[in-house]
Amino acid sequence: MSGNTLGTLFTVTTFGESHGPAIGCVIDGCPPGMGLTEADIQFELDRRKPGTSRHVTQRQEADEVEILSGVFEGVTTGTPIALLIRNTDQRSKDYGNIVETFRPGHADYTYWQKYGIRDYRGGGRSSARLTAPIVGAGAVAKKWLRERFGVEVRGYMSCLGEVDVPFVDWSHVRENPFFSPNAAIVPELEAYMDALRKDGDSIGARIDVVASGVPVGWGEPVFDRLDADIAKAMMSINAVKGVEIGAGFDSVAQRGSVHGDELTPAGFVGNHAGGVLGGISTGQDITVSIAIKPTSSIRTPRRSITKAGEEATVETFGRHDPCVGIRATPIAESMLALVLIDHALRHRAQCGDVETSTPKIAGSAT
């Protein structure tokens, strides 16, 4: 298995399995001289960790991070930063019924056919448990981007199943377990999830992420375009089945006179492009949306096959998120931050001294 590293100059290599002794990552390429403590990382991990409400998995993991290397006297040294998170609440016996069968919609079948072996305990390497190290690495990236460029990366849930969540204010997001930007709709979301849980079923969600303060110029055309790398990173998140940047699929029905964001001396008139043109950041907000499929592990019996190819019925009994999208906001934020820091360093390496006579216009003319 070789696809375990994200990035070019700022790289993150994750390791571990859902029911192994620990999970973690090694970050390489972090600039030296940045203050960094475990508390900086723990704040983000606490936003993602399981067991925080009745609407997510009841697996109780503290997700306490340990910095093993790359930091001396509270400052990054420029050497690899190793982060470790110990697993403490595994219940592997819950998965005894799928040792010989494959869960529909999961990676069980494909991992088995590719590698000839699979860790059936909680999905092993394919588990969303492995997003915790990504969030840990994302905390490092967020801190550097904020301190070096004033970049802020924030996200929220914009849709839960059939329930749209209209944006009201960023301050609402941190006040509820759904990362909803609309406090008034939270009771409806809770009732929706309660009914879903009684049905033994699951549902998907849409998450929107915004990066503000990104300067013009980040991105490496043609094959490492900023939007291409963002899409790849987002599609690397468990259960993500779609990515939109800017207007996304709505662009299909827009005319060029509408979609093309006009430029004025005062700034851009619109942002249908989502802050990226030609694979390079424009200086506007970078806007990304992801579609997350329903959790595949549900209590409703489903048809499947055994390793021998015989018919079987699968019912999952482990502790699972009825909607993985509820905890996905910090993960999507982290993925965007990791792509941005990598491109910031790549831009600095090749084009850091480039200057033009054209003034950099504002992201918005209003």
Swiss-Prot record:
Cofactor: how bound: Reduced FMN (FMNH(2)).
Binding locations of FMN: 125-127, 238-239, 278, 293-297, 319
A cellular-component GO term for this protein: cytosol
Pathway(s) the chain acts in: Metabolic intermediate biosynthesis; chorismate biosynthesis; chorismate from D-erythrose 4-phosphate and phosphoenolpyruvate: step 7/7
Tagged with keyword Repressor: no
CDD domains linked to this entry: Chorismate_synthase (cd07304)
An example molecular function term from Gene Ontology annotations: chorismate synthase activity
UniProt keyword list: Amino-acid biosynthesis, Aromatic amino acid biosynthesis, FAD, Flavoprotein, FMN, Lyase, NADP
A biological process term (GO) from this entry: amino acid biosynthetic process
Reactions the enzyme catalyzes: 5-O-(1-carboxyvinyl)-3-phosphoshikimate = chorismate + phosphate
InterPro entries attached to this UniProt entry: Chorismate_synth (IPR000453), Chorismate_synth_AroC_sf (IPR035904), Chorismate_synthase_CS (IPR020541)
EC nos: 4.2.3.5
Gene3D superfamilies, sorted: Chorismate synthase AroC (3.60.150.10)
Residue sites binding NADP(+) per the record: 48, 54
Cofactor: FMNH2
Enzyme class: lyase
Keyword Flavoprotein applies: yes
Recorded family membership: Belongs to the chorismate synthase family.
Known partners and oligomeric status: Homotetramer.
Role of this protein: This reaction introduces a second double bond into the aromatic ring system.
Matches recorded under PANTHER family: CHORISMATE SYNTHASE
NCBIfam families hit by this protein: aroC, PRK05382.1
Name of the protein in question: Chorismate synthase
